[in-house]
A protein has these predicted regions:
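Core segments of cupin and vicinal oxygen chelate
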Residues: 54-105, 150, 166-170, 217-270, ...
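Fold-core signature of tandem repeat domains
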Residues: 69-71, 109, 186-189, 234, ...
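N-terminal secretory signal peptides that target proteins for export/translocation
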Residues: 1-14
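Bacterial N-terminal signal peptides
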Residues: 16-34
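Short, charged/polar, Gly/Pro-enriched secondary-structure boundary elements
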Residues: 117-118, 184, 282, 347
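Extended intrinsically disordered, low-complexity coil regions enriched in Ser, Thr, Gly, Ala
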Residues: 59, 63, 67, 72-79, ...
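Vicinal oxygen chelate
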Residues: 36-43, 46-57, 96-109, 120-207, 239-264, ...
C-alpha cells in the first residue's frame, strides 16, 4: 500500500508539472500580440501628409489658392483606371489632381472630369459633421483680413475674432473663417507670442506661412479618440472648451460651445476634433457622400505598415471606402500602396505607404 501511494504521489507530481507546462504554453500563446499591435511599440501613422479637397474647376481653384493665399503649384496630374476606381470607390473616374504647397505643408485639389459629383449644400454650417477646414497661419491677421476682403472672399465669421483670456489654452489666438470658390471652409489664424509652433513666429516677410492643422467636426470626442489615438497612434497634445461671443462669431453659430482636442503625429500638421456641446443640431455626413462630391475632403496619413493598419481597422470594424489595400505601381500620387477608410463620423482618411 505504501509503494502504491508513492506511485500515486509521483503520478500526481508528473501530471501537475504537465498541467503547469501546458498552462504556461497557453499563456505564452495568448500573450503574443496580434500583428497590428505594432502600434503599442510606435504609432501606425507617422504624419498628416496632405489634406485633399474635391473642386469643380481646378484652374479656378489654382488661381484662388496661389493668388489669394500664396500657395505654389507643385504638380498637376490626370489619373484614371481601375486602381484609382478601387481606391476612391468611384467607377469610371478620371480626375485631375493638383498638388499645392504653402511653407512645409501641402494640399491636393482634385477635379473629377468624370463622373461629376454633387455640390456643397448651401445651408452648410460649422457644426455639420461634414465640416472640415485647414488652418492657415498668418503673422498679421488684420493685414490678411484686409487682403481677403480685397479679393472678395465669402465670409463665414462676421470678422476676425480674438479668443478671450478665460479660454486659457487659446487665450489671445486670433482667427477668421471664410470660404474658397467651392464653399470649402478655411481659417486664417494668428498665434500670440506664447503659443504655437516657433516657426509660426518667423515670417521672413510672408503674410501666409503654412498649415498648422486641419479641423473636423465630430459627434463624440471619446469615440473619435478611439480611432485617431488608440488605433492610429496620434497623440492628444491639448484640449480646451471654447465658448462665448467671440467663439460664436468665429463659427457663426449662436450659442456655440465646443470641446476642442488637438492631435499630433510624429510629423506634419495636426488634426483638431471639434465637438459641439451646444447646439447639438449638427447634421451627420451624408451616407451617399463620395469622393467626387464637392463636400469631400480627404486627409492623407503616412504609415510604414499598411498591412498592420488595415488589420487594426478591420478588428474595430471601421468601414473601408477602398476595396482593400490598393497597389499603385506608378506612384503618380507619390505612394505605391494606399487605402481609404471612414472615421467614426464618416470623414474619409487615406492611409498611404511609399
Amino acid at each position: 500500500m505504501q509503494r502504491q501511494s508513492k506511485r500515486g504521489v509521483c503520478s500526481r507530481i508528473v501530471v501537475g508539472q504537465l498541467c503547469v507546462a501546458i498552462t504556461s504554453l497557453a499563456f505564452s500563446i495568448a500573450c503574443v500580440p496580434p500583428m497590428w499591435a505594432a502600434a503599442a511599440h510606435g504609432p501606425l501613422v507617422r504624419a498628416v501628409e496632405s489634406v485633399g479637397m474635391t473642386v469643380a474647376d481646378a484652374d479656378r481653384s489654382i488661381d484662388f489658392y496661389s493668388t489669394v493665399l500664396s500657395f505654389q503649384k507643385i504638380s498637376d496630374t490626370e489619373l484614371e483606371g481601375s486602381d484609382y476606381e478601387h481606391l476612391e470607390g468611384v467607377f469610371g473616374l478620371r480626375m485631375r489632381v493638383v498638388r499645392m504647397r504653402l511653407g512645409d505643408e501641402s494640399i491636393e485639389l482634385t477635379e473629377y472630369l468624370s463622373p461629376k459629383g454633387k455640390p456643397v449644400a448651401m445651408d452648410s454650417h460649422s457644426n455639420d459633421r461634414w465640416f472640415q477646414h485647414i488652418a492657415i497661419i498668418t503673422v498679421d491677421i488684420d493685414r490678411a483680413y484686409a487682403w481677403l476682403r480685397q479679393n472678395r472672399v465669402q465670409h463665414v465669421s462676421s470678422a476676425p475674432q480674438t479668443l478671450p483670456a478665460y479660454i486659457k489654452p487659446a487665450a489671445g489666438v486670433r482667427a477668421f473663417y471664410f470660404e474658397d470658390p467651392d464653399h470649402h471652409p478655411l481659417e486664417i489664424l494668428e498665434f500670440p507670442s506664447d503659443k504655437g509652433n516657433p516657426k509660426w513666429h518667423r515670417s521672413d516677410g510672408k503674410l501666409f506661412l503654412g498649415i498648422d492643422h486641419t479641423a473636423i467636426a465630430v459627434a463624440n470626442t471619446s469615440v473619435s479618440l478611439a480611432f485617431y489615438q488608440d488605433v492610429l497612434g496620434f497623440r492628444a497634445v491639448g484640449e480646451s472648451e471654447n465658448y462665448g461671443p467671440e467663439q460664436e462669431h468665429l463659427n457663426n453659430i449662436f450659442g456655440a460651445r465646443l470641446r476642442i482636442t488637438s492631435l499630433r503625429g510624429v510629423e506634419g500638421p495636426g488634426i483638431e476634433l471639434l465637438e459641439y456641446l451646444t447646439p447639438r443640431g449638427g447634421r451627420s455626413m451624408p451616407v451617399d457622400e463620395q469622393a467626387n462630391d464637392l463636400v469631400h475632403h480627404q486627409t492623407r496619413l503616412v504609415t510604414d505598415d499598411l498591412e498592420a493598419a488595415l488589420k487594426a481597422l478591420q478588428e474595430k470594424h471601421y468601414p473601408l471606402v477602398s476595396s482593400g489595400i490598393v497597389a499603385l505601381p506608378k506612384a503618380e500620387i507619390g505612394f505605391h500602396f494606399a487605402l481609404i477608410v471612414r472615421d467614426p463620423d464618416g470623414h474619409p482618411i487615406e492611409l498611404a505607404k511609399r
